[in-house]
Amino acid sequence: ILRPTLPTGGHATMGKSLYVAAAKTCPGLSWTVLAAIGGIESDHGADTSVSSAGAEGPMQFEPATFAQYAVDGDGDGLARIDDPYDAVYTAARMLCSDGAGRGGAALTAALFAYNHAVWYPPEVLSLAARYAGS
């Protein structure tokens, strides 16, 4: 079950401030979209087990995809798939490169590129709307 509100806390917690900061790297991308992805993929870092497809970490990247877009989000000199800061900033970079900042159909296409499931874009957008309203 997805949390209706975002967690708060320190470095290991994926809270609103992290999503807001990462979204600012992609003009037009709402922090709520990143938060919705984090909520769907790992319940904001609560479940980071490796998926059956091999996706890992709080934003559930396949290692090759993470390597392609990797960002050192916390400035420690490393971009790690299991680090919440690195993973969220990397998600923002990937989404932005796929046109998410343009909104509308481009955002939907970027979300589908993030997770190739028909149900995924509407689920992300629905949860993002809930976060925007909270």
Question: What are these regions, as identified by a protein language model?
Answer:
Residues 1-134:
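Catalytic glycan-binding domains that act on GlcNAc-containing polysaccharides
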